[in-house]
């Protein structure tokens, strides 16, 4: 059920108290004996809330210390590129991360302009560096972000030398060792206090960090002079902006110069959009680009939460209203790994835009015919188009980490997630980023408009006229731990029925089509659609996804039958 405030402007009384949240980050010590307070990597890093003891100073210190301990196992021998988004907790977490890197004599490359650094910019920096790096100077990266989560949340993720999200083997190793540090406490961490360095090395520090006067930091066996040598300034922004013609037809955009509204959504890439508009002299109107960790300009999401989800029509409601005479609007989440595309018809669903992007890229890039990577919950239209145009589909579990090696070695031209995350290859067929990039997906929509004269929404209509018009829904369902456990351990044989939503079942899978990796749930395919259920990694709920070619009524039947199937699992497994 949609919350009555969904789509309405956020009220002042619902905004976070930044000072309180930051104090909780340093003040609260997580209890390693409480499962919820231990380090736990989901599909993209460790996330939590300071007041609940799930994202605090010790979590960040323990994770970064572990990264320093084991990064050479993953091939990282050189600098660590570090970025952060605009969540309130990202600033103190960045401070802690830098201090631990310095204490371990790992070169920390931070933004030269004291600006925020988006996820795709970190990924691009790692790949740019490693393209010419010697064996003893291979880079990796750390990104401080809880993505589109509400303002009180914090998060941290690790990108190894391939530039994308760490795979499960890497995160499990980090998780296990970090929890050992969590048990030992801050005294076990090698760390150089940022206070000593700010005055001596002002030119390179991030400028965004919070400083606690009474903060206790275990001394590191490193001098002030030596620590200064391990903190390096790097111009993330302009390196990224100047390389855009390698992946986007910026000349076509310049020539057409359509009027585009950019909703920076208070995120880490606001300065990037300004730099792009200036560098290429584009007709962009940029809003919500100021730093506001309360995200006071937002509208409530579907459940009444403040969530910076650029793919949500409720969170993007105010932007849709402001489209005016702009042909297109683009939105991004706080760390800029997601995209939202708005036309006069409204906000395009990610599944709609991603199939449009796949078709357009295949028709315009020299590397056309490359495979398309999609998660198990991306629209079946993608399969229909790819099968008709004779290029392979790589269907993987949910999580962009599964696309990183496929993009890195060029097996796929596009990697696409239903949650509005994607990246694609450069014009010459080489890798751009191995993490999601919301900026290039936004610019691609502008390029489409410039070269075809059609908006992505109009191009989607062209696609559905050939392969049908599916309807899609995703719902988060509260559940017991028993249902989550049963769902994660589900086998295809647990589904005994022959129909779902009134249509014959063609296939039941608990592994992906590509490499048969566990999807931590189940996918049921019928002759008129599909249903997926998978448990949340951090909350007592499971996610239901369904797509039907039988309209809204068919979708409702599919969802209801799927829900009954999942909730019957506990009885089946007892």
Enumerate the predicted regions with their spans.
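Phosphate-binding chemistry for phosphorylated carbohydrates and sugar-nucleotides
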Residues: 12-15, 20, 24-27, 106-124, ...
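Ferredoxin-reductase
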Residues: 2-12, 75-164, 383-384
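Internal gly/pro-rich beta-alpha loop/helix module
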Residues: 130-202, 209, 216
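Catalytic-core signal marking the mid-to-C-terminal active-site face
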Residues: 454-574
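An N-terminal, well-structured beta->alpha segment
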Residues: 2-103, 128, 205-208, 214, ...
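Flexible hinge/switch segments at interdomain interfaces of large molecular machines
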Residues: 33-43, 193, 216-219, 286-293, ...
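Short beta-strand segments
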Residues: 83, 141-147, 331-334, 415, ...
